[in-house]
């Protein structure tokens, strides 16, 4: 256990990406750019140990995956989809009917094409399809393309069923940096897209960083993380599994628990130690807990909030007797979960907001994925002659001050 100042003194995040990967990523991207599908099939065999004669999964296969899915899973995916869709519709930026007197305003248009990366390494993630493709669908994106790593037994039925529910246009079995390159450049089979979203490993993250500018991206994702503020009213057995749930994603997953009550932290530590040997996915969870788990004793409310805002975690959970004051004070988090019945895991699947959230302190300056990330925003300036005449002198004078005389002349010629 550390006090807040001790934690802050030692707190630092390693660079989210391993710079030594740069030449590997560059070579993969160049290979895909030059050799297209041939390179993708080679990398499927090299990295995923899977021979893929056909990169695209047919619409018939996608529909069959949904049709033959067990009813309980189908209903769960459908409920998640409906909640995500309803929430995203409620926050979507829309074009407003404006009075004729309004001379400057904004209009929104959906992106034409989007690529979605769905991880497929240590687990199957139909939830990622729902938390990304639904947003693109609500935005009105014309062409939604999913890429996901090939598996020896094929792409998981649940992932394909989620693609069917969200009306994804095409699904390709290709993963890693090579899939990001394919979506950026286009190949004989995979279409070039305008933007790529979705979480992935370091190779995926670095490829997105490397190719940004040639294609839009959502973020450079690092290891997943959660920070919780708790007091003596929190259910510590539930907190144990809030911590384990995050830790089971990745050995590098980070978990932080903050409390003003040192005894609560000691009790929690004891329960984690007791439960750990029997936890599912022990190899992953135990490494995360051993290396990336922190118990932090805060001296007061402001101290706890300061620590939380410094961490700027992907997920923040407040489980205290009176969580309301934290809603305004905790400013820099990907998503804020309030109360005993709002565990972070519910946000992973069915709450409504996307689970694609900023990591590695990037919540200090960016936000979680939303429907509005699939829209362009254009400003429209349509001035009347009267308005032009009211402001033209100021504009042409500023142009003169900046010695941009053609700018100035563009205005003067209209005044004459």
From Swiss-Prot:
Binds 1 zinc ion per subunit. The active site is at residues 314-315. Its EC number is 1.1.1.23. CDD domains: Histidinol_dh. Zn(2+) binds at residues 246, 249, 348, 407. Pathway: Amino-acid biosynthesis; L-histidine biosynthesis; L-histidine from 5-phospho-alpha-D-ribose 1-diphosphate: step 9/9. It catalyses: L-histidinol + 2 NAD(+) + H2O = L-histidine + 2 NADH + 3 H(+). Disulfide bonds: none annotated. InterPro entries: Ald_DH/histidinol_DH, Histidinol_DH_CS, Histidinol_DH_monofunct, Hstdl_DH. Its cofactor is Zn(2+). Keywords: Amino-acid biosynthesis, Histidine biosynthesis, Metal-binding, NAD, Oxidoreductase, Zinc. One of its GO terms (cellular component) is cytosol. Substrate binds at residues 224, 246, 249, 315, 348, 402, 407. One of its GO terms (molecular function) is histidinol dehydrogenase activity. The keyword Ribonucleoprotein does not apply. GO terms for biological process: L-histidine biosynthetic process. NAD(+) binds at residues 117, 178, 201. PANTHER family: HISTIDINE BIOSYNTHESIS TRIFUNCTIONAL PROTEIN, HISTIDINOL DEHYDROGENASE HDH. Catalyzes the sequential NAD-dependent oxidations of L-histidinol to L-histidinaldehyde and then to L-histidine. Belongs to the histidinol dehydrogenase family. This is Histidinol dehydrogenase.
């Amino acid at each position: 256990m550390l006090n807040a100042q001790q934690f802050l003194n030692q707190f630092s995040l390693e660079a989210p990406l391993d710079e030594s990967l740069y030449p590997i990523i560059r070579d993969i991207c160049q290979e895909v750019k030059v050799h297209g599908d041939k390179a993708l099939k080679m990398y499927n065999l090299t990295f995923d140990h899977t021979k893929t004669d056909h990169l695209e999964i047919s619409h018939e296969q996608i529909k069959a995956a949904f049709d033959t899915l067990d009813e309980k899973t189908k209903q769960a995916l459908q409920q998640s989809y409906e909640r995500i869709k309803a929430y995203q519709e409620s926050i979507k930026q829309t074009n407003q009917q404006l009075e004729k007197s309004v001379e400057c305003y904004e209009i929104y248009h959906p992106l034409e094409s989007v690529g979605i990366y769905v991880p497929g390494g240590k687990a199957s993630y139909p939830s990622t399809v729902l938390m990304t493709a639904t947003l693109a669908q609500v935005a009105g994106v014309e062409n939604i393309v999913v890429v996901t790593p090939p598996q020896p037994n094929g792409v998981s039925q649940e992932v394909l069923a989620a693609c069917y529910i969200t009306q994804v246009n095409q699904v390709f079995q290709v993963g890693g940096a090579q899939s990001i390159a394919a979506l950026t450049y286009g190949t004989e089979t995979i279409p070039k897209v305008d933007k790529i979203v979705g979480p992935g490993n370091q190779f995926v993250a670095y490829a997105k960083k490397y190719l940004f500018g040639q294609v839009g991206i959502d973020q450079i994702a690092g290891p997943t993380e959660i920070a919780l503020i708790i007091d003596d009213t929190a259910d510590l057995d539930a907190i144990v599994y809030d911590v384990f749930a995050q830790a089971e994603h990745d050995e590098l997953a980070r978990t932080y628990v903050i409390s003003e009550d040192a005894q609560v932290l000691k009790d929690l530590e004891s329960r984690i130690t007791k439960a750990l040997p029997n936890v599912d996915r022990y190899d992953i969870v135990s490494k995360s807990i051993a290396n990336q788990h922190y118990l932090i004793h805060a001296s007061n409310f402001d101290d706890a909030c300061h620590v939380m805002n410094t961490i700027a975690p992907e997920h923040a959970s407040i489980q205290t007797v009176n969580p309301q004051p934290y809603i305004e004070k905790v400013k820099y988090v990907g998503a804020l979960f309030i109360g005993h019945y709002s565990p972070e895991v519910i946000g992973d699947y069915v709450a409504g907001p996307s689970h694609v959230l900023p990591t590695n302190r990037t919540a200090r300056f960016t936000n979680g994925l939303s429907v509005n990330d699939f829209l362009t925003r254009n400003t429209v300036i349509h001035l009347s002659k009267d308005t032009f005449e009211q402001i033209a002198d100021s504009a042409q004078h500023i142009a003169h001050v900046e010695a941009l005389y053609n700018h100035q002349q563009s205005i003067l010629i209209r005044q004459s």
